[in-house]
Amino acid sequence: MITGRTALYGVVGHPVAHSRSPEMQNAAFARLGVDAIYVALPVAPERIDEALRGAHALGFQGLNVTVPHKPRAASLCHALDPVATAVGAANTLRRTRDGWEGFNTDAPACRSLLEAAGVARGSRALLVGAGGAARAAAWALVQLGTELRVAARREEAAAELCRDLAAAVPGADLAAADFEDLEAEADAAAVVVNGTSVGLPGHEGRLPPLRFRADQVVLDFVYGDTDLARAARAAGARLVSGEQVLVRQGALAFTIWTGQPAPEADMARALEAREGAR
């Protein structure tokens, strides 16, 4: 039951109606008996500054941040954890007296899932995209010791990501790649990560069709039955789905907010239940 003492949490994005985070986080609150509610908060890009100030004024205890607000959210926090600082993007905010403290849970979520999928040190990796999610994936791939190539439609964005991460992680092996050579880069890679919003509801555009192999690991940040995920499954590649990333990063966020271990299995079941009801 919602009362005057119920703590407020939410996810900020544009668009955000498709988000599965409310089902997942509310299931976690219910499982552990936390008096809290989590809602989706649609915020246009030009309103993000006032939205974060307003959420703090309204007493929200924590927020997740999704496309396209992660880099801007990091710049609006009064403090950042070391990963968010290195990545230059924040996807989890925790209320403090002075404002928001920013964290990046996408990056450690990616690292743990890719490591579990068998990504080996020294392997070649291709990252597609240069936004907030891509920056988190780049950090994860660098931490795993891969030879990373970053391809984005805007070449300068890929180059900027590489410069920023090289400065934050000395010794990182990464460089920008030509987006026009995406198919060849994917063929040469042992790991392919889609860090773009292609496949997300409300986002136009497609990636060039990529052919995968059974010996590759493919991670798609976008959840659902995307073209990329279907191609990876058809090839027998080891697929790390957007749902897996969502659950893992959400579990890390839950712990940041509550100080309690997240009921990750319950969170995953909440996503499966929604998918089954569609």
UniProtKB/Swiss-Prot annotation:
It holds the Pfam family SDH_C. Pathway: Metabolic intermediate biosynthesis; chorismate biosynthesis; chorismate from D-erythrose 4-phosphate and phosphoenolpyruvate: step 4/7. It is an enzyme of class 1 (oxidoreductase). Its EC number is 1.1.1.25. Belongs to the shikimate dehydrogenase family. This is Shikimate dehydrogenase (NADP(+)). Shikimate binds at S19, R20, S21, T66, N91, D106, Y223. HAMAP family: Shikimate_DH_AroE (MF_00222).
